[in-house]
Amino acid sequence: MKRVIVIGGGLAGLIASIRLARWNIACTVVEKKKYPFHRVCGEYISNETVPFLQKEGLYPETFDPPQINRFQLSSVNGNSTTLPLDLGGFGISRYQFDHFLYEKAKEAGVDFLLDTEVETVDFTGDTFEIKTSNRSIAAPIVIGAFGKRSRLDHYLDREFFKRRSPYVGVKYHVHTHHPSNLIALHNFRGGYCGISNIE
């Protein structure tokens, strides 16, 4: 049986691997970290994904994620408005959600190479060769779900990798009194701060 290699074990890589395994397609996910771990990423998931997640048995209901249906926007000068968020969403940490999907992937039969970073990917004939620091693996199909600004982006000589961004992203979890159904976006000079509840 031919194997699919998925590079990157975030939401896209994990869900792709689960679906492949459920279609009886052998799949290996290569992830540079070990689960569970935090990601610098928004932790608001739109409700447009809920029917799919429920159909696939991947909705994280065991965490009782807060249901978010209000949106607050503030300007640099401090003016703000709050309005209904029609479609809405739910809040869950990537620490929990990714680990939840990782466990689901293992149940489905997905193989994992954790704590392993892909250094190069080359295509010869009809086969991809993936090299890490300590091994080489081959597959006819590779899914790149590794996000942006990775070692592979550098190896593939992608243009955006050469242009450094003047921005930085920071995620911080705090205990505070914030309405569980509200996602807020507060703007300040040169950036913004998003606040929403998680499980």
Question: Regions from the language model: what does each represent?
Answer:
Residues M1-A12:
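Beta1/beta-strand and adjacent pyrophosphate-binding region of the FAD-binding site
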Residues W23, K104-E199:
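Predominantly flavin-linked oxidoreductase catalytic cores and closely associated redox partners
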Residues A26-C27, Y59, D111:
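Residue-level detector of anion-binding/catalytic polar loops
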Residues L14-I15, N47-E48:
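Short alpha-helical segment within the catalytic ATP-binding CA
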Residues T49-K104, F123:
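A conserved beta-strand/loop capping segment in the N-terminal third of enzymes
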Residues I7, I18-C41:
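Glycine-rich FAD pyrophosphate-binding loop
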Residues I15, R19, V142:
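Hydrophobic/aromatic ligand-binding patch that stacks against planar heteroaromatic rings
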Residues A12, Y35, R149:
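Conserved Rossmann-like nucleotide-cofactor binding loop
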